[in-house]
Swiss-Prot record:
Catalytic activity: pyruvate + acetyl-CoA + H2O = (3R)-citramalate + CoA + H(+)
Species for this entry: Methanosarcina mazei (strain ATCC BAA-159 / DSM 3647 / Goe1 / Go1 / JCM 11833 / OCM 88) (Methanosarcina frisia)
EC number: 2.3.3.21
Sequence similarity: Belongs to the alpha-IPM synthase/homocitrate synthase family.
Pathway: Amino-acid biosynthesis; L-isoleucine biosynthesis; 2-oxobutanoate from pyruvate: step 1/3
Function comment: Catalyzes the condensation of pyruvate and acetyl-coenzyme A to form (R)-citramalate.
Pyruvate carboxyltransferase domain ranges (all copies): 1-245
UniProt name for this protein: Putative (R)-citramalate synthase CimA
Principal EC category: transferase
PANTHER family documented for this protein: (R)-CITRAMALATE SYNTHASE CIMA (PTHR42880:SF2), HOMOCITRATE SYNTHASE (PTHR42880)
UniProt-listed HAMAP family: CimA
Length: 483
Protein backbone atom coordinates (compact mmCIF):
# COMPACT_ATOMS: atom_id res chain seq x y z
CA UNK A 1 0.00 0.00 0.00
CA UNK A 2 2.88 2.39 0.78
CA UNK A 3 4.48 2.08 -2.65
CA UNK A 4 1.11 2.23 -4.38
CA UNK A 5 0.32 5.47 -2.58
CA UNK A 6 3.54 6.94 -3.97
CA UNK A 7 1.82 7.07 -7.36
CA UNK A 8 1.94 10.75 -8.39
CA UNK A 9 -1.29 12.47 -7.39
CA UNK A 10 -2.40 9.85 -4.85
CA UNK A 11 -2.88 10.72 -1.16
CA UNK A 12 -4.91 8.34 0.99
CA UNK A 13 -6.74 9.43 4.11
CA UNK A 14 -6.86 7.24 7.19
CA UNK A 15 -10.37 6.11 6.27
CA UNK A 16 -9.33 5.14 2.74
CA UNK A 17 -6.29 3.25 4.00
CA UNK A 18 -8.50 1.29 6.38
CA UNK A 19 -10.89 0.35 3.57
CA UNK A 20 -8.03 -0.86 1.38
CA UNK A 21 -6.29 -2.67 4.24
CA UNK A 22 -9.48 -4.55 5.14
CA UNK A 23 -9.99 -5.54 1.50
CA UNK A 24 -6.39 -6.81 1.29
CA UNK A 25 -6.83 -8.72 4.54
CA UNK A 26 -10.01 -10.35 3.24
CA UNK A 27 -7.99 -11.47 0.20
CA UNK A 28 -5.56 -13.18 2.63
CA UNK A 29 -2.58 -10.95 1.82
CA UNK A 30 0.25 -11.92 4.20
CA UNK A 31 1.94 -8.55 4.78
CA UNK A 32 0.53 -5.04 4.32
CA UNK A 33 3.03 -2.18 4.19
CA UNK A 34 0.65 0.45 5.54
CA UNK A 35 2.89 3.48 5.06
CA UNK A 36 6.02 5.26 6.19
CA UNK A 37 5.74 6.33 9.83
CA UNK A 38 8.41 9.01 9.45
CA UNK A 39 6.37 10.93 6.82
CA UNK A 40 4.08 12.95 9.10
CA UNK A 41 1.89 12.87 12.19
CA UNK A 42 -1.10 12.21 9.93
CA UNK A 43 0.64 9.27 8.30
CA UNK A 44 1.48 7.84 11.72
CA UNK A 45 -2.17 8.10 12.71
CA UNK A 46 -3.16 6.22 9.55
CA UNK A 47 -0.55 3.48 10.01
CA UNK A 48 -1.53 3.10 13.67
CA UNK A 49 -5.20 2.78 12.70
CA UNK A 50 -4.38 -0.03 10.27
CA UNK A 51 -2.13 -1.74 12.82
CA UNK A 52 -4.89 -1.63 15.45
CA UNK A 53 -7.72 -2.70 13.12
CA UNK A 54 -7.56 -6.34 14.21
CA UNK A 55 -6.42 -7.66 10.82
CA UNK A 56 -4.85 -11.07 10.31
CA UNK A 57 -2.09 -9.72 8.05
CA UNK A 58 1.29 -8.60 9.34
CA UNK A 59 1.32 -4.78 9.34
CA UNK A 60 4.56 -3.13 8.26
CA UNK A 61 6.07 0.37 8.09
CA UNK A 62 8.75 1.58 5.71
CA UNK A 63 11.94 2.77 7.46
CA UNK A 64 15.25 4.24 6.40
CA UNK A 65 18.41 3.10 8.21
CA UNK A 66 17.76 5.76 10.86
CA UNK A 67 16.83 4.86 14.43
CA UNK A 68 14.26 7.65 14.70
CA UNK A 69 12.39 6.00 11.79
CA UNK A 70 12.23 2.83 13.86
CA UNK A 71 11.02 4.80 16.89
CA UNK A 72 8.18 6.30 14.85
CA UNK A 73 7.27 2.84 13.56
CA UNK A 74 7.13 1.57 17.15
CA UNK A 75 4.73 4.41 18.00
CA UNK A 76 2.38 3.01 15.35
CA UNK A 77 2.19 -0.50 16.88
CA UNK A 78 3.28 -2.20 13.64
CA UNK A 79 4.45 -5.82 13.56
CA UNK A 80 7.38 -5.27 11.23
CA UNK A 81 9.51 -2.75 9.38
CA UNK A 82 10.74 -2.67 5.80
CA UNK A 83 14.26 -1.40 6.51
CA UNK A 84 15.66 0.03 3.28
CA UNK A 85 19.43 0.29 2.75
CA UNK A 86 20.97 2.05 -0.28
CA UNK A 87 23.32 -0.55 -1.77
CA UNK A 88 24.39 0.73 -5.20
CA UNK A 89 27.46 2.96 -5.32
CA UNK A 90 25.32 5.58 -7.08
CA UNK A 91 22.91 5.78 -4.13
CA UNK A 92 25.64 5.49 -1.49
CA UNK A 93 27.73 8.31 -2.99
CA UNK A 94 25.06 10.73 -4.18
CA UNK A 95 22.09 10.18 -1.90
CA UNK A 96 23.49 9.50 1.55
CA UNK A 97 27.11 10.57 0.87
CA UNK A 98 28.76 7.74 2.79
CA UNK A 99 31.04 4.82 1.97
CA UNK A 100 30.31 1.10 1.73
CA UNK A 101 31.74 0.15 5.12
CA UNK A 102 29.74 2.85 6.90
CA UNK A 103 26.53 1.71 5.21
CA UNK A 104 27.16 -1.90 6.28
CA UNK A 105 27.72 -0.85 9.88
CA UNK A 106 24.68 1.45 10.09
CA UNK A 107 22.41 -1.16 8.49
CA UNK A 108 23.50 -3.80 11.00
CA UNK A 109 23.16 -1.39 13.95
CA UNK A 110 19.63 -0.29 13.01
CA UNK A 111 18.58 -3.90 12.35
CA UNK A 112 19.81 -4.87 15.81
CA UNK A 113 18.05 -1.86 17.36
CA UNK A 114 14.74 -2.81 15.74
CA UNK A 115 15.07 -6.44 16.86
CA UNK A 116 15.81 -5.34 20.43
CA UNK A 117 12.47 -3.51 20.35
CA UNK A 118 10.55 -6.58 19.22
CA UNK A 119 10.02 -5.83 15.54
CA UNK A 120 10.15 -8.23 12.62
CA UNK A 121 12.77 -6.84 10.21
CA UNK A 122 12.86 -7.17 6.45
CA UNK A 123 16.21 -5.78 5.32
CA UNK A 124 15.91 -4.39 1.82
CA UNK A 125 18.68 -3.45 -0.61
CA UNK A 126 17.62 -0.30 -2.46
CA UNK A 127 18.80 -0.28 -6.09
CA UNK A 128 20.03 -3.86 -5.73
CA UNK A 129 20.01 -4.43 -9.49
CA UNK A 130 22.77 -1.79 -9.91
CA UNK A 131 24.75 -2.88 -6.85
CA UNK A 132 27.90 -4.97 -6.69
CA UNK A 133 26.56 -8.44 -5.89
CA UNK A 134 29.41 -9.20 -3.50
CA UNK A 135 28.72 -6.04 -1.50
CA UNK A 136 24.98 -6.74 -1.51
CA UNK A 137 25.61 -10.22 -0.07
CA UNK A 138 27.82 -8.69 2.62
CA UNK A 139 25.03 -6.26 3.63
CA UNK A 140 22.56 -9.14 3.75
CA UNK A 141 24.94 -11.34 5.79
CA UNK A 142 25.55 -8.53 8.31
CA UNK A 143 21.79 -8.08 8.56
CA UNK A 144 21.20 -11.78 9.21
CA UNK A 145 23.86 -11.71 11.94
CA UNK A 146 22.06 -8.71 13.47
CA UNK A 147 18.77 -10.63 13.50
CA UNK A 148 17.03 -9.73 10.22
CA UNK A 149 14.10 -12.06 9.58
CA UNK A 150 13.80 -11.51 5.83
CA UNK A 151 15.79 -9.91 3.02
CA UNK A 152 14.62 -8.08 -0.09
CA UNK A 153 16.18 -7.42 -3.49
CA UNK A 154 14.85 -4.15 -4.97
CA UNK A 155 14.90 -3.51 -8.70
CA UNK A 156 14.33 0.15 -7.94
CA UNK A 157 14.32 1.51 -11.49
CA UNK A 158 13.17 -1.61 -13.33
CA UNK A 159 16.46 -2.65 -14.97
CA UNK A 160 16.22 -6.41 -14.45
CA UNK A 161 15.41 -8.88 -17.22
CA UNK A 162 13.96 -12.33 -16.41
CA UNK A 163 17.14 -14.25 -17.36
CA UNK A 164 19.32 -12.12 -15.07
CA UNK A 165 16.69 -12.29 -12.32
CA UNK A 166 16.74 -16.08 -12.41
CA UNK A 167 20.56 -16.14 -12.22
CA UNK A 168 20.68 -13.72 -9.27
CA UNK A 169 17.97 -15.42 -7.24
CA UNK A 170 19.37 -18.90 -7.69
CA UNK A 171 22.60 -17.53 -6.24
CA UNK A 172 21.02 -15.57 -3.37
CA UNK A 173 18.49 -18.19 -2.32
CA UNK A 174 21.16 -20.88 -2.14
CA UNK A 175 23.84 -18.80 -0.39
CA UNK A 176 21.86 -16.81 2.21
CA UNK A 177 20.33 -18.16 5.41
CA UNK A 178 17.17 -16.07 5.36
CA UNK A 179 14.17 -15.95 3.03
CA UNK A 180 14.50 -13.33 0.30
CA UNK A 181 11.82 -11.19 -1.34
CA UNK A 182 11.62 -9.55 -4.75
CA UNK A 183 10.54 -5.92 -5.29
CA UNK A 184 10.20 -4.90 -8.95
CA UNK A 185 9.36 -1.67 -10.72
CA UNK A 186 7.79 -1.61 -14.16
CA UNK A 187 9.87 0.98 -16.04
CA UNK A 188 10.40 -1.39 -18.98
CA UNK A 189 7.16 -3.34 -18.56
CA UNK A 190 8.95 -6.36 -17.04
CA UNK A 191 7.90 -6.13 -13.38
CA UNK A 192 5.54 -9.11 -13.47
CA UNK A 193 7.91 -11.26 -15.55
CA UNK A 194 10.86 -10.49 -13.25
CA UNK A 195 8.81 -11.11 -10.11
CA UNK A 196 7.61 -14.50 -11.34
CA UNK A 197 11.16 -15.39 -12.46
CA UNK A 198 12.49 -14.56 -8.98
CA UNK A 199 9.83 -16.67 -7.28
CA UNK A 200 10.56 -19.60 -9.59
CA UNK A 201 14.28 -19.26 -8.74
CA UNK A 202 13.85 -19.32 -4.96
CA UNK A 203 12.36 -16.03 -3.73
CA UNK A 204 9.89 -16.63 -0.90
CA UNK A 205 7.92 -13.38 -1.03
CA UNK A 206 6.94 -10.78 -3.64
CA UNK A 207 6.26 -7.08 -3.17
CA UNK A 208 3.26 -6.12 -5.32
CA UNK A 209 0.61 -3.41 -5.60
CA UNK A 210 -3.04 -3.52 -6.65
CA UNK A 211 -3.39 -2.42 -10.30
CA UNK A 212 0.41 -2.10 -10.51
CA UNK A 213 0.30 1.34 -8.89
CA UNK A 214 3.54 3.00 -7.85
CA UNK A 215 6.07 5.66 -8.74
CA UNK A 216 6.83 6.35 -12.41
CA UNK A 217 5.59 3.28 -14.35
CA UNK A 218 4.44 1.51 -11.20
CA UNK A 219 5.27 -1.74 -9.45
CA UNK A 220 4.62 -5.40 -10.11
CA UNK A 221 0.87 -5.92 -10.22
CA UNK A 222 -0.66 -8.13 -7.53
CA UNK A 223 -3.36 -9.46 -9.83
CA UNK A 224 -0.88 -10.34 -12.58
CA UNK A 225 1.63 -12.05 -10.29
CA UNK A 226 -1.04 -14.00 -8.39
CA UNK A 227 -2.78 -15.21 -11.54
CA UNK A 228 0.49 -16.11 -13.26
CA UNK A 229 1.29 -18.31 -10.28
CA UNK A 230 -2.22 -19.73 -9.92
CA UNK A 231 -3.16 -20.23 -13.57
CA UNK A 232 0.12 -20.71 -15.42
CA UNK A 233 2.29 -22.35 -12.75
CA UNK A 234 -0.59 -24.14 -10.96
CA UNK A 235 0.70 -22.86 -7.62
CA UNK A 236 -1.82 -22.25 -4.83
CA UNK A 237 -0.98 -18.81 -3.42
CA UNK A 238 -3.68 -18.94 -0.74
CA UNK A 239 -5.05 -15.62 -2.06
CA UNK A 240 -8.83 -15.35 -2.42
CA UNK A 241 -8.63 -14.80 -6.15
CA UNK A 242 -12.38 -14.27 -6.59
CA UNK A 243 -11.98 -10.94 -4.77
CA UNK A 244 -9.27 -9.60 -7.09
CA UNK A 245 -11.52 -7.58 -9.40
CA UNK A 246 -13.60 -6.10 -6.60
CA UNK A 247 -10.45 -4.97 -4.79
CA UNK A 248 -9.02 -3.53 -8.01
CA UNK A 249 -12.16 -1.43 -8.49
CA UNK A 250 -12.05 -0.29 -4.85
CA UNK A 251 -8.43 0.86 -5.13
CA UNK A 252 -9.12 2.63 -8.42
CA UNK A 253 -12.06 4.48 -6.88
CA UNK A 254 -10.24 5.48 -3.68
CA UNK A 255 -7.01 6.56 -5.38
CA UNK A 256 -8.71 8.26 -8.31
CA UNK A 257 -6.40 6.42 -10.72
CA UNK A 258 -8.41 4.73 -13.50
CA UNK A 259 -7.41 1.28 -14.68
CA UNK A 260 -6.31 1.21 -18.31
CA UNK A 261 -8.94 -0.56 -20.45
CA UNK A 262 -6.36 -3.02 -21.78
CA UNK A 263 -4.78 -3.73 -18.38
CA UNK A 264 -4.31 -7.47 -17.95
CA UNK A 265 -7.08 -9.20 -15.97
CA UNK A 266 -8.72 -6.14 -14.39
CA UNK A 267 -8.91 -3.73 -17.35
CA UNK A 268 -12.31 -3.02 -18.85
CA UNK A 269 -11.46 -4.88 -22.07
CA UNK A 270 -9.72 -7.90 -20.50
CA UNK A 271 -12.78 -10.15 -20.91
CA UNK A 272 -14.69 -8.04 -23.44
CA UNK A 273 -15.29 -9.26 -26.99
CA UNK A 274 -16.54 -7.49 -30.11
CA UNK A 275 -15.14 -9.17 -33.22
CA UNK A 276 -17.72 -11.51 -34.74
CA UNK A 277 -15.32 -14.40 -35.28
CA UNK A 278 -14.26 -14.24 -31.63
CA UNK A 279 -17.82 -14.24 -30.32
CA UNK A 280 -18.73 -17.11 -32.63
CA UNK A 281 -15.82 -19.08 -31.17
CA UNK A 282 -16.80 -18.19 -27.60
CA UNK A 283 -20.30 -19.52 -28.14
CA UNK A 284 -18.81 -22.83 -29.25
CA UNK A 285 -16.19 -23.00 -26.49
CA UNK A 286 -15.21 -20.14 -24.17
CA UNK A 287 -11.58 -21.30 -24.17
CA UNK A 288 -11.22 -20.36 -27.84
CA UNK A 289 -10.62 -16.68 -27.04
CA UNK A 290 -10.17 -16.55 -23.26
CA UNK A 291 -7.08 -17.76 -21.36
CA UNK A 292 -9.06 -18.33 -18.17
CA UNK A 293 -12.54 -17.97 -16.75
CA UNK A 294 -13.32 -14.35 -15.74
CA UNK A 295 -15.40 -15.65 -12.82
CA UNK A 296 -12.15 -16.91 -11.25
CA UNK A 297 -11.27 -13.33 -10.31
CA UNK A 298 -14.82 -12.16 -9.71
CA UNK A 299 -15.55 -10.85 -13.21
CA UNK A 300 -17.97 -11.57 -16.03
CA UNK A 301 -17.30 -11.63 -19.75
CA UNK A 302 -18.93 -8.92 -21.82
CA UNK A 303 -19.95 -8.83 -25.46
CA UNK A 304 -19.93 -5.33 -26.96
CA UNK A 305 -21.40 -4.21 -30.24
CA UNK A 306 -19.90 -2.06 -32.96
CA UNK A 307 -18.51 -2.16 -36.48
CA UNK A 308 -16.68 -5.46 -35.80
CA UNK A 309 -19.72 -7.23 -34.33
CA UNK A 310 -21.02 -10.38 -35.98
CA UNK A 311 -24.42 -11.98 -36.11
CA UNK A 312 -23.45 -14.25 -33.22
CA UNK A 313 -22.95 -11.17 -31.03
CA UNK A 314 -26.40 -9.83 -31.93
CA UNK A 315 -28.07 -13.19 -31.32
CA UNK A 316 -26.42 -13.54 -27.91
CA UNK A 317 -27.24 -9.97 -26.87
CA UNK A 318 -30.90 -10.36 -27.86
CA UNK A 319 -31.10 -13.61 -25.92
CA UNK A 320 -29.72 -11.91 -22.81
CA UNK A 321 -32.40 -9.22 -23.21
CA UNK A 322 -35.12 -11.85 -23.40
CA UNK A 323 -36.01 -10.88 -26.98
CA UNK A 324 -36.76 -13.29 -29.81
CA UNK A 325 -36.09 -12.36 -33.43
CA UNK A 326 -36.37 -14.37 -36.62
CA UNK A 327 -33.56 -14.46 -39.18
CA UNK A 328 -34.82 -11.45 -41.13
CA UNK A 329 -35.28 -9.34 -37.99
CA UNK A 330 -31.85 -10.35 -36.69
CA UNK A 331 -30.34 -9.33 -40.03
CA UNK A 332 -32.02 -5.91 -39.86
CA UNK A 333 -30.84 -5.34 -36.28
CA UNK A 334 -27.34 -6.47 -37.32
CA UNK A 335 -27.27 -4.00 -40.24
CA UNK A 336 -28.41 -1.09 -38.04
CA UNK A 337 -25.74 -1.86 -35.43
CA UNK A 338 -23.10 -2.02 -38.18
CA UNK A 339 -24.31 1.30 -39.54
CA UNK A 340 -23.90 2.96 -36.13
CA UNK A 341 -20.44 1.43 -35.76
CA UNK A 342 -19.36 2.69 -39.19
CA UNK A 343 -20.37 6.19 -38.08
CA UNK A 344 -17.91 5.89 -35.19
CA UNK A 345 -20.63 5.58 -32.56
CA UNK A 346 -20.19 3.46 -29.46
CA UNK A 347 -23.20 1.11 -29.43
CA UNK A 348 -24.42 0.70 -25.86
CA UNK A 349 -26.79 -1.90 -24.41
CA UNK A 350 -29.51 0.75 -24.32
CA UNK A 351 -28.90 1.56 -28.01
CA UNK A 352 -29.36 -2.10 -28.95
CA UNK A 353 -32.52 -2.25 -26.85
CA UNK A 354 -34.01 0.68 -28.79
CA UNK A 355 -32.96 -0.75 -32.17
CA UNK A 356 -34.35 -4.19 -31.33
CA UNK A 357 -37.64 -2.86 -29.99
CA UNK A 358 -38.04 -0.72 -33.12
CA UNK A 359 -37.38 -3.62 -35.50
CA UNK A 360 -39.55 -6.00 -33.49
CA UNK A 361 -42.25 -3.33 -33.15
CA UNK A 362 -42.19 -3.56 -29.37
CA UNK A 363 -42.60 -0.60 -27.09
CA UNK A 364 -41.89 -1.01 -23.41
CA UNK A 365 -42.87 1.81 -21.12
CA UNK A 366 -39.86 2.89 -19.02
CA UNK A 367 -40.20 1.72 -15.43
CA UNK A 368 -38.28 4.77 -14.20
CA UNK A 369 -39.32 8.07 -15.79
CA UNK A 370 -37.90 11.53 -15.25
CA UNK A 371 -40.52 14.15 -14.39
CA UNK A 372 -38.28 17.09 -13.51
CA UNK A 373 -35.06 18.10 -11.78
CA UNK A 374 -33.43 21.29 -10.49
CA UNK A 375 -29.74 22.06 -9.91
CA UNK A 376 -28.28 24.72 -7.60
CA UNK A 377 -24.54 25.33 -7.97
CA UNK A 378 -22.01 28.12 -7.62
CA UNK A 379 -18.59 29.05 -6.26
CA UNK A 380 -19.95 29.48 -2.70
CA UNK A 381 -22.68 26.85 -2.79
CA UNK A 382 -22.48 23.09 -2.31
CA UNK A 383 -23.87 21.65 -5.56
CA UNK A 384 -27.38 20.41 -4.78
CA UNK A 385 -29.96 18.66 -6.96
CA UNK A 386 -33.63 17.88 -6.42
CA UNK A 387 -35.35 15.38 -8.67
CA UNK A 388 -38.84 14.03 -9.26
CA UNK A 389 -39.11 10.54 -10.76
CA UNK A 390 -41.98 8.24 -11.58
CA UNK A 391 -40.81 4.82 -10.39
CA UNK A 392 -43.20 2.03 -11.33
CA UNK A 393 -46.13 4.51 -11.34
CA UNK A 394 -45.14 5.97 -7.97
CA UNK A 395 -43.99 9.59 -7.74
CA UNK A 396 -40.77 10.01 -5.76
CA UNK A 397 -39.01 13.27 -4.90
CA UNK A 398 -35.43 13.22 -3.62
CA UNK A 399 -32.39 15.48 -3.28
CA UNK A 400 -28.66 14.96 -3.40
CA UNK A 401 -25.40 16.85 -3.01
CA UNK A 402 -22.09 16.20 -4.73
CA UNK A 403 -18.70 17.45 -5.81
CA UNK A 404 -20.35 19.11 -8.81
CA UNK A 405 -23.79 19.43 -10.40
CA UNK A 406 -23.48 16.14 -12.31
CA UNK A 407 -22.41 14.27 -9.17
CA UNK A 408 -25.27 15.88 -7.21
CA UNK A 409 -28.00 14.90 -9.68
CA UNK A 410 -26.69 11.34 -10.00
CA UNK A 411 -26.69 11.03 -6.20
CA UNK A 412 -30.28 12.32 -6.14
CA UNK A 413 -31.28 9.68 -8.71
CA UNK A 414 -29.57 6.98 -6.63
CA UNK A 415 -31.61 7.96 -3.57
CA UNK A 416 -34.85 8.14 -5.53
CA UNK A 417 -34.52 4.63 -6.99
CA UNK A 418 -33.14 2.96 -3.86
CA UNK A 419 -36.35 0.92 -3.47
CA UNK A 420 -35.90 -0.87 -6.80
CA UNK A 421 -32.20 -0.42 -7.55
CA UNK A 422 -30.54 -0.21 -4.16
CA UNK A 423 -27.24 -1.84 -5.10
CA UNK A 424 -26.66 -0.12 -8.44
CA UNK A 425 -23.05 1.03 -8.83
CA UNK A 426 -21.85 3.64 -11.32
CA UNK A 427 -18.65 1.95 -12.50
CA UNK A 428 -17.67 4.24 -15.36
CA UNK A 429 -18.56 7.74 -16.55
CA UNK A 430 -17.18 9.07 -19.82
CA UNK A 431 -17.84 12.35 -21.65
CA UNK A 432 -17.13 13.25 -25.29
CA UNK A 433 -17.82 16.51 -27.11
CA UNK A 434 -19.33 15.31 -30.37
CA UNK A 435 -19.28 18.76 -32.02
CA UNK A 436 -17.22 21.90 -31.45
CA UNK A 437 -18.01 25.23 -29.84
CA UNK A 438 -19.55 26.25 -26.54
CA UNK A 439 -22.89 24.77 -27.66
CA UNK A 440 -21.26 21.43 -28.51
CA UNK A 441 -23.33 18.26 -28.48
CA UNK A 442 -22.08 16.21 -25.55
CA UNK A 443 -22.29 12.42 -25.38
CA UNK A 444 -22.15 10.81 -21.94
CA UNK A 445 -21.54 7.07 -21.63
CA UNK A 446 -22.01 5.24 -18.35
CA UNK A 447 -21.49 1.72 -17.11
CA UNK A 448 -23.82 0.60 -14.34
CA UNK A 449 -23.74 -2.69 -12.45
CA UNK A 450 -26.01 -4.51 -10.02
CA UNK A 451 -25.24 -7.86 -8.41
CA UNK A 452 -22.58 -8.70 -10.98
CA UNK A 453 -24.58 -7.70 -14.06
CA UNK A 454 -23.17 -4.75 -16.01
CA UNK A 455 -24.81 -2.64 -18.71
CA UNK A 456 -23.77 0.39 -20.72
CA UNK A 457 -25.95 3.32 -21.74
CA UNK A 458 -25.53 6.77 -23.22
CA UNK A 459 -27.18 10.16 -23.46
CA UNK A 460 -26.50 13.01 -25.89
CA UNK A 461 -27.51 16.63 -25.31
CA UNK A 462 -25.96 20.09 -25.55
CA UNK A 463 -26.30 20.22 -21.74
CA UNK A 464 -23.84 17.89 -19.98
CA UNK A 465 -26.15 17.55 -16.96
CA UNK A 466 -29.11 16.56 -19.13
CA UNK A 467 -26.91 14.13 -21.07
CA UNK A 468 -25.72 12.58 -17.79
CA UNK A 469 -29.26 12.20 -16.47
CA UNK A 470 -30.41 10.67 -19.75
CA UNK A 471 -27.54 8.15 -19.75
CA UNK A 472 -28.13 7.10 -16.14
CA UNK A 473 -31.91 6.84 -16.65
CA UNK A 474 -31.43 4.70 -19.77
CA UNK A 475 -29.08 2.43 -17.87
CA UNK A 476 -31.35 2.17 -14.83
CA UNK A 477 -34.30 1.14 -16.97
CA UNK A 478 -32.21 -1.61 -18.56
CA UNK A 479 -31.13 -2.93 -15.16
CA UNK A 480 -34.57 -2.73 -13.56
CA UNK A 481 -36.22 -4.34 -16.58
CA UNK A 482 -33.67 -7.17 -16.53
CA UNK A 483 -34.96 -8.18 -13.12
Amino acid sequence: MRDGEQTPGVALTKEKKLLIARALDEMKINVIEAGSAITSAGERESVRAVANAGLSAEICSYCRIVKTDVDHALECDVDSIHLVVPVSDLHIRTKIKKDRDTVRQIAADVTEYAKEHGLIVELSGEDSSRADLGFLKAVYSDGIDAGADRLCFCDTVGLLVPEKTTEIFRDLSSSLKAPISIHCHNDFGLATANTVAALAAGAKQAHVTINGLGERAGNASLEEVVMCLEWLYKYDTGIKHEQIYRTSRLVSRLTGIPVSPNKALVGGNAFTHEAGIHVHGLLADKATYEPMSPEYIGRQRQIVLGKHAGRSSITLALKEMGLEADDAQTEEIFNRVKQMGDQGKHVTDADLQIIAETVLDIYKEPLVKLEEFTIVSGNRVTPTASIKLNVKDKEIVQAGIGNGPVDAVINAIRRAVSSCAEDVILEEYHVDAVTGGTDALVEVRVKLSKEGKSITASGARTDIIMASVEAVMNGLNRLVRAE
